[in-house]
């Protein structure tokens, strides 16, 4: 094939998604050394390593990465395009021209077309990526997010958010009161609000909506 093709590039394909990053690096170097041709890498995510193996391939000299937006693809999906983009840009210092703030719009459109929802905790795209429930260091969420997060929320068109739930503390309640324009509260009221917030969070096994918190505030103030 090399002699009679001849190919423009060589694709290394991990169809079953079972190659380790170390194995992929070895294969890229070996094939590149043997052929002298550009290398393309195509992986699947059966072991959750699709992005890791493609990043490893790039460090070994691969010039082309195959990916799918939202990590879609057969079975467990292909390497997630948005994760590769941010990884190459932020972790490996590649100078790219990508408009990262457009990723949420693209992801939402594709999710609707494919009828596959985006998990709240999905890297890069998840709605919960920049949420802080614990009361520890919540001031950084809004004012210095890189203290708390691996990427700045604004890079991908998002913002930090404080939510209330079973792990919240008084500081979170105070912050939420201010954010929603609900004024201040006495210490005993704060303690009661926090108790009720935790009760609701435990009961629903999720964080509270602003409407649920408003109901708690009104109930506590009403006595």
Predicted region positions:
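A mid-to-C-terminal "edge-of-domain" accessory segment
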Residues: 92-223
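Conserved, mostly hydrophobic/aromatic
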Residues: 10, 61, 84, 177
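Glycine-rich phosphate-binding active-site loops on the catalytic face of alpha/beta enzymes
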Residues: 12, 60-77
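Aromatic/hydrophobic pocket-lining residues that form the small-molecule binding cavity
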Residues: 24, 50, 103
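Alpha/beta enzyme core
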Residues: 1-37, 54-60
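Active-site beta-loop-alpha junctions enriched in small/polar residues
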Residues: 13-17, 42-48, 70
């Amino acid at each position: 094939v090399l002699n009679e093709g001849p190919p423009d590039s060589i694709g290394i394909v991990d169809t079953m998604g079972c190659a380790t990053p170390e194995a992929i690096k070895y294969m890229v170097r070996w094939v590149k050394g043997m052929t002298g041709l550009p290398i393309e890498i195509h992986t699947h995510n059966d072991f959750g390593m699709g992005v890791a193996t493609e990043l490893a391939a790039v460090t070994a000299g691969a010039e082309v990465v195959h990916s799918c937006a939202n990590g879609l693809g057969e079975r467990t999906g292909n390497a997630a395009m948005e994760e590769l983009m941010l990884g190459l840009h932020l972790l490996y210092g590649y100078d790219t021209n990508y408009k990262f703030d457009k990723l949420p719009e693209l992801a939402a459109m594709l999710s609707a077309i494919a009828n596959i929802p985006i998990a709240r905790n999905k890297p890069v795209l998840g709605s919960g990526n920049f949420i802080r429930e614990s009361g520890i260091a919540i001031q950084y969420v809004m004012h210095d997010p890189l203290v708390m997060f691996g990427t700045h929320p604004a890079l991908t068109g998002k913002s930090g958010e404080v939510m209330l739930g079973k792990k919240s503390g008084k500081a979170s309640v105070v912050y939420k009161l201010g954010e929603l324009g609900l004024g201040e509260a006495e210490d005993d009221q704060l303690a009661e609000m926090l108790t009720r917030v935790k009760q609701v969070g435990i009961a629903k096994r999720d964080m509270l909506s602003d409407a649920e918190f408003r109901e708690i505030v009104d109930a506590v103030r009403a006595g």
